[in-house]
């Protein structure tokens, strides 16, 4: 789903709906963020996982020798991969809460995406959104944010943790504070994207990464 706002430097945010319910509460929360971004002049695209089966990463390393493309050829991964390669200015990932964590299919997609394309996502503002019936939201929120904080991506905050509550589709709209949090997130992301695009200093210098373990 693509949403068009008033274009400003062709800035765009990709939103990934990690729920198997394409039009459920996670989609509704992400749509609130997207509408706010559009009102701020930022174009948006929402890609939904839906009920598609998603292969997990097997650490084969082929993406490092294959032009940053995963060895598994599923349509969903390449749809997200192509959106990132075509150029985005920000990323929002949304998920329902299952057993205190994000949807497993979403994590499988993100594992592959960030392993193969972390350099393309570097310094892009990012945020996660979680929706739950009752509990586990903060644990799922923390899990998703780890992808961003390991990839040199600035986290966009809101007035509260980016979570909303609802069980049946559309019920999340009754969470007034949750919906306001989504709108604040959209405005804050638009602000950060503009500031980064208008900046004169450029990005920080990166050191060559060092990989160690607890043995050496």
Predicted feature residues:
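Short, Lys/Arg-enriched N-terminal segments with co-localized hydrophobic residues
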Residues: 1-10
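Helix-loop-strand module that forms the ligand-binding subsite of alpha/beta enzymes
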Residues: 65-160
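N-terminal beta-loop-helix "entrance" segment that forms/cooperates
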Residues: 49-69, 168-171
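Glycine-rich phosphate/pyrophosphate-binding loop and the adjoining helix
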Residues: 39, 154-216
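N-terminal beta1-alpha1 ligand-phosphate binding loop
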Residues: 12-40
